[in-house]
Every structure is written in C-alpha cells, then in structure tokens.
Amino acid sequence: MSDAAFPSRRGLTGDALKLLAILAMTLDHIAWLLFPGYPAQAMPLTMHIIGRLTCPIMCYFIAEGYHYTRNFRRYALRLFLLAIVSHFAYIYASNAYQDWRSFIPFYSGSVLNQTGVVWSLLGGLLMLRVNDLDCAVWKKAALILLLCLLTFPADWSCIAALCILSIGSNRGNPKKQLLWCTFYVSLYGAVYYFSLDRLYGVLQLCVFLSVPLLRLYNGARSKNAALSRVMKPLFYLYYPLHLFAIGLIRTFFLS
C-alpha cells in the first residue's frame, strides 16, 4: 500500500489511479457479460485479472476519503445513496436478473452477491468510524462483527469492508496494511476456490497486482484541474452508470 507521507510528487496521481480502476472495472464487467460463468479461456481470464485492480484501489480511496473528509455524515450519506442506486444497477446487469422480483435481496435463495460492492465499501467506511469511537474494545468488536454480517451478502462480501478497515487503521504502515489485506483476500480466495470455482478462486489473488500501483501514489491530484473536477464524482457515479449500460446491452442485444 502507499505511505502516508509523500516525499516526492513523482508517480501516479489519485486521478490516474481512479481512471485506471474505472478502465479495469469496465473490462472485468464486459468479460462477465460476454463470457458468463467461469470459462478457462485466455481472453476472459486476462480481462478478469486486469479487473482485480479495481477493488483494492476503491478500498484505498475510501480509507483516504475517511481520513480527509471534513463531514463524515455527508460522506457516509452519499455512499449510502450510491449503494442504493448501485443495488438496482448491479442486479440488472447480472445474470441473475429475470424480472422486478430479482431486485429483492435473497429472492433467488442465495446469500451471496445480493448487491453491489458499494454496500461493502460503505461498511468499511463505518468500520473506520467505529474503530475511532471512544468506547470499550468489546463494543467496537461487536459493532464491526455486525457490519461484517450486514455486508456479507454484497459483492466482495465483507472482505472489501475489512480491507478498508485494515488500510485506514494502519495508515502510514504499509507492511501492516498489506499483511491484513493479504489475510482477508486469501480467505476470500479460499472460499471462492472451494465453493465456486478453483481457477477463479486463485484468480482473486491477482488483486495484489495493485500493490505496486498504490505504492506509486504520490498523494496529489492531476495537474489538469478540469480532469480533477470530473474524476471526483465520476469515480463513484461510473459504477452504477456502466452497470445499467451493461444491463441494457444484455436485455436488448444478448437475451
């Protein structure tokens, strides 16, 4: 992960990393659209490997956003509203969508992948808040466990939330950040390996390809002021927008 202090402005700006995350996510979701299931083919595997760059970058910037925000409630509210909108976009874009009842959580009978990753990102933000509360450790642990249960049905389950907690609570200590994230992602990969698909379980470990990129983060925004203004909302709004687009393509062209 990245250091808290930035001795040099060389490297990648936050806007560059966010743009990279957007491109990787788009490629990943196009792969799910064109190659449903878990095909062991070079093209979809390559696209999914590149797509593993997205979640760690998102988690990192949620943790950074928590550190820098001047209004936590507004930040959390925006993320909550985005999670609600993204839920409908996520289900509409997924192979599980059939009709309006598909939008009802757990209607399919599964407890996994019932909503988008933004729900887990929100859970991670709330975990950081809980971690900073002035209360007994057992109360913090209980609240974090509750948030794990609430985010478990989301894409990336509670793992994304726990990674945000690890990154934010160990800010300035890249070794601890990486150690805890490695533990959580390995756990996720193991569950994926034994319950869904072995090859794609191993593929989840490709999230660590994002570590060298995050180490290059220089803590700065783009020198292009217009790009910087656009990237701030686009980084979040692009998620539901591109999923709605994928859903439309699936409905009208691939059904």
Regions found by a protein language model. Give the residues of each.
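Alpha-helical transmembrane segments and their immediate juxtamembrane cytosolic regions
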Residues: M1-S255
